[in-house]
C-alpha cells in the first residue's frame, strides 16, 4: 500500500509579527536586524514619517483619512479610530496566519489605541493571538501610566496570551552607563526570543517532537504568559539554561502558579536523558502547583557543548493565584490534637447528619436536648429524679432560724 502526502497541506504554521505604533515598529526593526527567521513582519502606524524607516515586508498606514499621516498625538482614542478606519487593510495583511504576535508600547496614542483593534481582528481570523507590550517608565507621568493600564486591559480581552514588559525594570537590569538603544534592546529581546523560540519549535523536527498544536494547547485563551530562552554550557549547563529561561527580570509575571508549560530542550549528541529530567524538575518546582508540562527534545549538532532551553508558561493570572488558597481550606485531621473549634469548622453538615454515632456528639454542652412532655412529669414522683435519694424536709420559717444542732435534739 502506498501513501502520498496532500500537497495542499501547509508544511508549517504561518507566524506573523505586527508592530503597532512607534514602539512596536522599533521592536520589529530590531528583530529584523537580529535576523529572526521563519516569520513575516508587518508594521502599522499613524505616523507616515515613522513608516518610512520601517524594515518590515508589509507597511500599513492607519487611518489615512482620520489622521492624515500625522500621528495620534498621544491620544489612544485617535489610535483606536484610525485602526477602525483601516480594519480591512489590517485583516488582509493578517490573512492566512496561524499565529500572530502583536507588539506595541503602551501609554502613547497609536499603540495603546490601535493594538486592541488589531488583536480583535486577529482573533476573528482564527489565529492564535499573542500580545507583547511594554509598560511605560514611571517618570513618564501618571497620565501615560493610566493610558497604558487601560490599553493593556482592552488588549487582554482580545488576545489568547499576553506578555507585559516593565520598562521600570530596565533601570534595575542595565548599568547606569548603558546607552539607551542598548537598554531598549534588552526589552526587545523578550519578544525576539519568544518569537524565535516558537518558530524553531514549529519548524525544527525534534526527537520528542513538539508542533504548533502543542503551542496552541498551552497558549490558547490562557491570559498572562511567560516566554524565555536560556543557553548555557559546561557541567551544570541544563540547570543554568533552565533557570535563565524561567526568570526574565523584565516581565511583570513569574512562572509561579503556571498551569501550562511547554518545555523544549535542544542540545548536541551528548545531551542526556537525565538533563531532560533535571530541566523538567526545575520547571515543576518553580511553578509550585499542579502544572501540566508538555516536553520536547531535539538534537542540533551545531550547538556543540551548549544546551538551549525554551519555556512557554501560561495560566498565571493573579486572579487565579488568589483563588488557590480556597481549594485547600480543609486540612488533614490529626487525632487527639484537633481543637473543638477546628472540628466545628472542618466538619461538613453532611457528616453531622449521617454520623456513625447518630445524633450523639462528644460536645455535649452544645447539643440540643430532646424536649420532654411536661404533662408526663406531673405524674412522676419527684423522688425519682433526686440523684442522692434525699428527702426534702418540710420546715417552716422558725425551723430555718434554729441551728441544725438543736433541731436534731428535738
From Swiss-Prot:
Region annotation (Disordered) maps to 318-410
Might you name a Gene Ontology BP term for this protein? protein polymerization
Per UniProt, which keywords does this protein have? Cell cycle, Cell division, Cytoplasm, GTP-binding, Nucleotide-binding, Septation
Q: Which CDD domains match?
A: FtsZ_type1 (cd02201)
Q: Does the keyword GTP-binding apply?
A: yes
**Does the record bear ATP-binding in its keywords?**
no
Q: Where along the chain is composition biased (Polar residues)?
A: 330-344
Which InterPro entries does this entry report, sorted A to Z? Cell_div_FtsZ (IPR000158), Cell_div_FtsZ_CS (IPR020805), FtsZ/CetZ (IPR045061), FtsZ_C (IPR024757), Tub_FtsZ_C (IPR008280), Tubulin/FtsZ-like_C (IPR037103), Tubulin/FtsZ_2-layer-sand-dom (IPR018316), Tubulin/FtsZ_GTPase_sf (IPR036525)
Database matches in PANTHER family: CELL DIVISION PROTEIN FTSZ-RELATED (PTHR30314), MITOCHONDRIAL DIVISION PROTEIN FSZA (PTHR30314:SF3)
HAMAP family membership:
FtsZ
Protein family per UniProt:
Belongs to the FtsZ family.
Name of the protein: Cell division protein FtsZ
- Please state the gene responsible for encoding this protein: ftsZ
Amino acid at each position: 500500500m502506498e501513501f502520498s502526502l496532500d500537497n495542499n497541506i501547509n508544511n508549517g504554521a504561518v507566524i506573523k509579527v505586527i508592530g503597532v505604533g512607534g514602539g512596536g515598529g522599533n521592536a520589529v526593526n530590531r528583530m529584523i536586524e537580529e535576523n529572526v527567521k521563519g516569520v513575516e513582519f508587518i508594521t502599522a502606524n499613524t505616523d507616515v514619517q515613522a513608516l518610512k524607516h520601517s524594515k518590515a515586508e508589509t507597511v500599513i498606514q492607519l487611518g489615512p483619512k482620520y489622521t492624515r499621516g500625522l500621528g495620534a498625538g498621544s491620544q489612544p482614542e485617535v489610535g483606536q479610530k484610525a485602526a477602525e478606519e483601516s480594519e480591512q487593510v489590517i485583516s488582509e495583511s493578517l490573512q492566512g496566519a496561524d499565529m500572530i504576535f502583536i507588539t506595541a508600547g503602551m501609554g502613547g496614542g497609536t499603540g495603546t489605541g490601535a493594538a486592541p483593534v488589531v488583536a480583535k481582528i486577529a482573533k476573528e481570523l482564527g489565529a492564535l493571538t499573542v500580545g507583547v507590550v511594554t509598560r511605560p517608565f514611571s517618570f513618564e507621568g501618571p497620565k501615560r501610566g493610566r493610558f497604558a493600564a487601560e490599553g493593556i486591559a482592552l488588549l487582554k480581552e482580545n488576545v489568547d496570551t499576553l506578555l507585559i514588559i516593565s520598562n521600570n525594570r530596565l533601570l534595575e537590569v542595565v548599568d547606569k552607563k548603558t546607552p539607551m538603544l542598548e537598554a531598549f534592546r534588552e526589552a526587545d529581546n523578550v519578544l525576539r526570543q519568544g518569537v524565535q523560540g516558537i518558530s524553531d519549535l514549529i519548524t525544527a523536527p525534534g526527537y520528542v517532537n513538539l508542533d504548533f498544536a502543542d503551542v496552541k494547547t498551552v497558549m490558547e485563551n490562557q491570559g498572562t504568559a511567560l516566554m524565555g530562552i536560556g543557553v548555557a554550557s559546561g557541567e551544570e549547563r541544563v540547570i543554568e539554561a533552565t533557570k535563565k529561561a524561567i526568570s526574565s527580570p523584565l516581565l511583570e509575571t513569574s512562572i509561579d502558579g503556571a498551569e501550562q508549560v511547554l518545555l523544549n530542550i535542544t542540545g548536541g549528541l551528548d545531551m542526556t536523558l537525565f538533563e531532560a529530567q533535571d530541566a523538567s524538575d526545575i520547571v515543576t518546582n518553580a511553578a509550585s502547583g499542579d502544572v501540566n508540562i508538555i516536553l520536547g527534545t531535539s538534537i542540533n549538532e551545531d550547538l556543540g557543548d551548549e544546551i538551549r532551553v525554551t519555556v512557554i508558561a501560561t495560566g498565571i493570572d493573579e486572579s487565579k493565584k488568589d483563588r488557590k488558597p480556597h481549594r485547600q481550606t480543609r486540612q488533614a485531621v490529626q487525632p487527639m490534637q484537633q481543637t473543638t473549634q477546628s472540628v466545628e469548622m472542618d466538619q461538613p453538615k453532611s457528616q453531622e447528619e449521617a454520623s456513625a454515632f447518630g445524633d450523639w456528639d462528644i460536645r455535649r454542652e452544645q447539643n440540643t436536648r430532646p424536649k420532654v412532655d411536661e404533662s408526663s412529669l406531673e405524674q412522676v414522683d419527684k423522688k425519682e429524679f433526686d440523684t442522692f435519694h434525699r428527702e426534702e424536709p418540710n420546715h417552716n420559717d422558725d425551723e430555718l432560724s434554729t441551728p441544725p444542732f438543736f433541731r436534731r435534739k428535738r
